[in-house]
């Protein structure tokens, strides 16, 4: 079973990492190609392209300028510890321990506009490049064209490894719609399950972005702590009061709901 999650805009490069273990991203050559394109952009270009303030645009232009290989612990940080948004609050990776991080390294992947696919312990340098950015490049008009089938091919490689190990070849999609558009479901060599998280508000259940993002991190942690092999075991997920609702779910879309009165 393989899980995919989205990255975060917020980054933490101040807190020391809780592990000395690290790996290097598989798609660094592709990332370097994108960095070369981004280095041709002015702060005004970046502000317009990414809808950023002048201050944030200048920060990211500086990041592109200083981005350099090779990655090492003194100039980069493990991805699962560097991202700092709602998903990562739920995941709380700093308290997973070495065993948890090791399991996550094999079963969890972070989709990235710049790095393509990241393992949790892959070192990364700070950046801002959301998957939906319409950055023109030699492969097409945007990042979906740039990554093409590369991300899907990598996920299929992982699903093949799961199958070879006698485990279920299932991809659990805990990424946002923007990021999962970089995956081509029809080409996946395994079952796809997409959990959704709904909260009760104004007389009905609905997806509330902040809570849903955090729940994706909570479910990732739930699987990591239990080292789950069977996707059916995810139906027992009950963190923060969520519960699986069979009548609202189907084979591929699993609904979890919470009502806080």
Swiss-Prot record:
Signal peptide: none
Annotated GO biological process: response to hydroperoxide
Lineage: superkingdom: Bacteria
GO annotation, cellular component aspect: cytosol
Family to which the UniProt record says this protein belongs: Belongs to the UPF0246 family.
Name assigned to this protein: UPF0246 protein azo1887
Lineage: Bacteria, Pseudomonadati, Pseudomonadota, Betaproteobacteria, Rhodocyclales
